[in-house]
Amino acid sequence: MTNINTACVKNNASYQVNNASPNKETISSNFCQRLAQWGNKSLNNGEERAIAVERIKEAYNLNMASLDLSYLDLSELPPIPSTVNTLNLENNCLTCLDFTDNASLANINLSFNKINTITFPNESKLENIYIDHNNLESLDLKNQHSLVNLEAQNNNLKKINISDSYKLKFLNLNYNKLASLDLSRQESLIELSAHHNMI
């Protein structure tokens, strides 16, 4: 296994992270440690973790707002810098995602994965969610007050909660297994597509 040596530079301080014990004195070194641990985890399944680590390091060191980790065959969510508000994870092999620590995200593309479980931050800044072509049976978007656009077609959705997404304008739920859909609070809705369901 190739050891990924992660160097993160933040606030004029440099942290060289290998397999040493995490430095808990600063958020910066803790992030670098978690990134190194994630990058060094070998699953022998064709994942391009080294490429992902390089892109994450660049986003972290340059305080970038956008991060593209698409088409890397990733099976686990890596640590995401807090400056990132637009995240592209399209076309990977992700199954279970937890974004509760990523409250700064506003735009997220998770299309064409294998996601069956996902958790979003409570009252996040999410405006655009692309989660089409996955394996979701339920989707809970409670407290997602900022959501404007949701693309969730081609899943196995039987249940969806968008009751708090009153700013929602665009909703695509085609090719799911929904038997009912409550849109009573979606007064801003401009475009709805929900064909090939059980409604």
Specify the residue positions occupied by each region the protein language model found.
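LRR N-terminal entry segment and analogous cap-like coil->beta motifs
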Residues: 40-97
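Leucine-rich repeat
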Residues: 80-84, 102-105, 121-126, 142-147, ...
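Non-core capping and flanking segments associated with repeat-based/extracellular domains
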Residues: 30, 36, 87, 108, ...
